[in-house]
């Protein structure tokens, strides 16, 4: 028997429950993975709450984990039983001790990277990859704004930006998070609880503002993010941690300087096995060389059955960096 987390209705963390099940054999194009570490991501809370409803209920949760391949479907040739793998784009159900996934959605994990490092960084790292390398290609010395710089995605973005020679200006909510972002490689930080975001950004940039803003916060920062952009600047809205942006008047983009807005997703940038290989190789190289460091605080590692508590703490904004479930 194996254990997985399910929910039968939408709601808060209390709807999550651990159930025992017998895993099915993998289909022809699938592999079965014994998960060793499972990534917890903010999008998981959107799915649980119903903001991004799953295809049906009851539903599993989670799309990211790292582990060992235990079984291989008859049509899979590039992965074998015993391989170490990581994945971030599975069907819902990664919050599980065993999970069947499409083989082309898994990447072979280099020996230099642990299961915990992989599960803590793969979805977030691939997200930073497409944001900084594809959605808008950040150049050396370029100044740009990145919200939630001390979160799981943010800390990887700080390190990746530094590796690119770029100048990430990060927003944070506490002095402790400011220190974390700066240590990771942020060029400047703005504490939005103590400083006026737009005015402080103007000070930092000598009044020029920035060409691109990366915003995973959503509703609370939408208009202020637009006000941080130069004429014809790009707003990259890639999350809704404060709630979804609704009722948008497109005329505001005209009024604030002929701005552009995009709402990208990982699936829009990494769909094929070739795209996954290109992205994961770049990410793994940065992690294995120590350019990107992935450390998960011990208090942010939870037994699989404690998924409720993990979600409560994540949504309280009390975490720094990544959190994991351990089967």
UniProtKB/Swiss-Prot annotation:
The keyword S-adenosyl-L-methionine does not apply. It comes from the Bacteria. The keyword Oxidoreductase applies. Pfam families: ADH_N (PF08240), ADH_zinc_N (PF00107). SUPFAM superfamilies: GroES-like, NAD(P)-binding Rossmann-fold domains. CDD domains: QOR2. NADP(+) binds at residues 42-46, 130, 152-153, 173-177, 192, 216, 238-241, 264-266, 317. Keywords: NADP, Oxidoreductase. Its EC number is 1.6.5.5. It catalyses: 2 a quinone + NADPH + H(+) = 2 a 1,4-benzosemiquinone + NADP(+). GO terms for cellular component: cytosol. One of its GO terms (molecular function) is protein homodimerization activity. Belongs to the zinc-containing alcohol dehydrogenase family. Quinone oxidoreductase subfamily. Homodimer. This is Quinone oxidoreductase 1.
């Amino acid at each position: 028997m194996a254990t997985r987390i399910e929910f039968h209705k939408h709601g808060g963390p209390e709807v999550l429950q651990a159930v025992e099940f017998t895993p099915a054999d993998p289909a022809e194009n699938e592999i079965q993975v014994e998960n060793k570490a499972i990534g917890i991501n903010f999008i998981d809370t959107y799915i649980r709450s119903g903001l991004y409803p799953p295809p049906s209920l009851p539903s599993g949760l989670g799309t990211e984990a790292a582990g060992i391949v235990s079984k291989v479907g008859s049509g899979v040739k590039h992965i074998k039983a015993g391989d170490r793998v990581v994945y971030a784009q599975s069907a819902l159900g990664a919050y599980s001790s065993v999970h069947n996934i499409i083989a082309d959605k898994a990447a072979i994990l280099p020996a230099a990277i642990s299961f915990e490092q992989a599960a803590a960084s793969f979805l977030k790292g691939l997200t930073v990859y497409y944001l900084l390398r594809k959605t808008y290609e950040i150049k050396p010395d370029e100044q740009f704004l990145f919200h939630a710089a001390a979160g799981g995605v943010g800390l990887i973005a700080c390190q990746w930006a530094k590796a690119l020679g770029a100048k990430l200006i990060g927003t944070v909510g506490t002095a402790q998070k400011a220190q974390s972002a700066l240590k990771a490689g942020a060029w400047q930080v703005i504490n939005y609880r103590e400083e006026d975001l737009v005015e402080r950004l103007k000070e930092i940039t000598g009044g020029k503002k920035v060409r691109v803003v990366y915003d995973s916060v959503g509703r609370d920062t939408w208009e202020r993010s637009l006000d941080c952009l130069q004429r014809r600047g790009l707003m990259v809205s890639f999350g809704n941690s404060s709630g979804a942006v609704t009722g948008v008047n497109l005329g505001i983009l005209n009024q604030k300087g002929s701005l552009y807005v995009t709402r990208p997703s990982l699936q829009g940038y990494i769909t094929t096995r070739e795209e996954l290989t290109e992205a994961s190789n770049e990410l793994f190289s940065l992690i294995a060389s120590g350019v990107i460091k992935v450390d998960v605080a011990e208090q942010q590692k939870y037994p699989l059955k404690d998924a409720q508590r993990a979600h409560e703490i994540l949504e309280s904004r009390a975490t720094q960096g990544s959190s994991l479930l351990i089967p």
